[in-house]
Amino acid sequence: MAARRPSPPPASPPPPRPRSTTTTRTTSSASAAPAAAQRLVAMAGSGKFFVGGNWKCNGTKESISKLVSDLNAATLESDVDVVVAPPFIYIDQVKSSLTDRIEVSAQNTWIGKGGAFTGEISAEQLVDIGCQWVILGHSERRHVIGEDDEFIGKKAAYALSQNLKVMACIGELLEEREAGKTFDVCFKQMKAFADNITDWTNVVIAYEPVWAIGTGKVASPEQAQEVHAAVRDWLKTNVSADVASTVRIIYGGSVNAANCAELAKKEDIDGFLVGGASLKGPDFATICNSVTSKKVTA
């Protein structure tokens, strides 16, 4: 697995390497693909299709009321888990008006019990207002706020201990992908989670290549599948075959109503973590219902 290197992102600057190196890498991955596919076909996550909507630092009381109304009116497939993550200050508004069909997540939480930590929100407080999920390790927390792998892993452990379910995010920067380090970066981030998590029942892994978040670029279905399969294989080797076969691995990075169906067809893509498109009720519903594409290929 260490010898494999991911294919470069679409429409990105060419990597600063000779063309022959890129060709060799692609050929090597292609020759290894059939064996990997045969090994992992039966290992795709066994839970329901999962779609999370990360609203980030967006919205007003008025716009969120409209979005919730759109979501309440949407017809969603029965075999998909749907979760939305409003900004902290709107969680209570969303919880009180959103259909029970859709669960609610926070976008972050503190590493431990509450106290003298100005500006932070504790897991206990989130549970107290009825929050069921939390997103941890998002690239904007890693690369804008400066949270490191160890800190994020400990956050995950504490959140789980307080009965929050966790969307655990991993993903590489553009320069890391171009340097052939995608797997190294993702596996390092996975190790920080694995070092702290003892029970994966309430964990969903979200692969979000940083170069595809909010950029309009999206990993091809083949690129996303390649990383998802590698992460599942890593789980089998480093955690357990049972976790590898049951945990859901979802994709995030400029997912929208137009590209979700093709991505959903891939064996190891168990759903999506959606950013901008989750702010548009009809588009988000379309993404949730892309589970029908998964049924076609099952």
UniProtKB/Swiss-Prot annotation:
Major localisation:
plastid
Broad class of enzyme this protein falls into? isomerase
Biological process (GO) annotations held by this record are: gluconeogenesis; glyceraldehyde-3-phosphate biosynthetic process; glycerol catabolic process; glycolytic process; reductive pentose-phosphate cycle
Q: Where in the cell is it found?
A: Plastid, Chloroplast
Gene3D superfamilies on file: Aldolase class I
Give the matching SUPFAM superfamilies: Triosephosphate isomerase (TIM)
Give the Enzyme Commission number. Answer: 5.3.1.1
Q: Which reaction does it catalyse?
A: D-glyceraldehyde 3-phosphate = dihydroxyacetone phosphate
A Gene Ontology molecular function term of the record = triose-phosphate isomerase activity
The annotated region (Disordered) lies at: 1-32
Cysteine derivative: residues bearing it:
C186
InterPro entries the UniProt entry points to: Aldolase_TIM (IPR013785), TIM_sf (IPR035990), TrioseP_Isoase_bac/euk (IPR022896), Triosephosphate_isomerase (IPR000652), Triosephosphate_isomerase_AS (IPR020861)
Q: Where is the composition biased (Pro residues)?
A: 1-18
Transit peptide segment: 1-43
Q: In which pathway does it act?
A: Carbohydrate biosynthesis; Calvin cycle
Q: Name the residues annotated as catalytic in the UniProt entry.
A: H138 (electrophile), E208 (proton acceptor)
Subunit structure and binding partners: Homodimer.
Q: What further note is attached to this protein's record?
A: In plants, there are two types of TPIS, cytosolic and plastid.
Q: Which family does it belong to?
A: Belongs to the triosephosphate isomerase family.
Name by which UniProt lists this protein: Triosephosphate isomerase, chloroplastic
Which organism's genome codes for this protein?
A: Secale cereale (Rye)
